[in-house]
């Protein structure tokens, strides 16, 4: 049985039982608040147990995306739940390769010398990888071409993202995440890199390689902020390396967050 069929079938079953009891006059109060409460409970149970009960449905798809002569690339990652692991390597004529548990939907386009890739979880997938539980969840494990200038956009939901971009040529990095943990090693040889992060109730950790300067601007609500002020002293409302304006390799970081933790080191 497919995960979606089981989940939505359970929802319809509960609604039908409540309507039957209402019709038989077994209760006279407004059952809709009860219905939505039960729906939330079922959804919670589903998120906790669904991936374990239906692991047989999970497939591992091996994907390679060729550069096709492109000299730079934009990649958007739409990863709703689970774990995403990113590193880099010598891939020759390929932009990336990797393993995508749960399948992958991709859209590839080319404009001049630039390649654009939009990578998403399949729409049929429903589930969440829970930290600390021993199952693969919806795991993406991929390698990026270390020698191609990149613009990356990560849109993630619940789960964990571990992004080792230290040996890449990432020029622009955007991270948008919800209730998750995100750890990023920033580029050490990309020249200037612009980083924009927006987070809800999330943990964000950015590691700036030694020899790379940084400027950090924060717009945070109730988050806990931890910035290495020995490397990035506070000047006014900005944390900045003393040599930021003249550094050959530098990262310009702007973070907007609600609740959670921000760590830049």
Sequence positions of predicted segments:
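Alpha-helical transmembrane segments and their membrane-interface anchoring/capping motifs
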Residues: 1-265
């Amino acid at each position: 049985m497919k995960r979606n069929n089981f989940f939505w079938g359970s929802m319809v079953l509960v609604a039908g039982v409540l309507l039957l009891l209402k019709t038989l006059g077994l209760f006279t109060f407004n059952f809709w608040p009860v219905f939505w409460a039960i729906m939330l409970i079922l959804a919670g149970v589903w998120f906790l147990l669904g991936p374990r009960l239906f692991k047989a449905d999970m497939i591992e798809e091996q994907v390679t995306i060729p550069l096709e002569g492109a000299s730079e690339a934009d990649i958007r990652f739409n990863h709703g739940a689970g774990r995403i692991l990113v590193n880099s390597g010598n891939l020759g004529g390929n932009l990336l390769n990797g393993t995508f548990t749960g399948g992958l939907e991709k859209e590839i386009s080319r404009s001049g010398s630039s390649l654009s890739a939009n990578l998403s979880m399949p729409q049929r997938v429903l589930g969440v990888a829970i930290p600390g539980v021993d199952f693969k969840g919806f795991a993406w494990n991929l390698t990026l071409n270390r020698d191609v200038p990149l613009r990356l956009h990560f849109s993630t939901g619940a789960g964990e993202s571990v992004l080792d971009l230290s040996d890449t040529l990432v020029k622009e990095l955007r991270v948008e995440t919800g209730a998750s943990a995100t750890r990023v090693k920033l580029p050490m040889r990309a020249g200037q890199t612009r980083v924009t992060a927006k987070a809800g109730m999330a943990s964000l950790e950015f590691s700036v390689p030694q020899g790379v300067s940084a400027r950090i601007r924060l717009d945070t609500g109730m988050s806990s902020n931890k910035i290495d002020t020995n490397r990035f002293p506070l000047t006014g409302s900005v944390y900045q390396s003393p040599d930021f304006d003249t550094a050959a390799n530098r990262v310009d970081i702007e973070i907007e967050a609600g609740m959670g933790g921000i760590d830049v080191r």
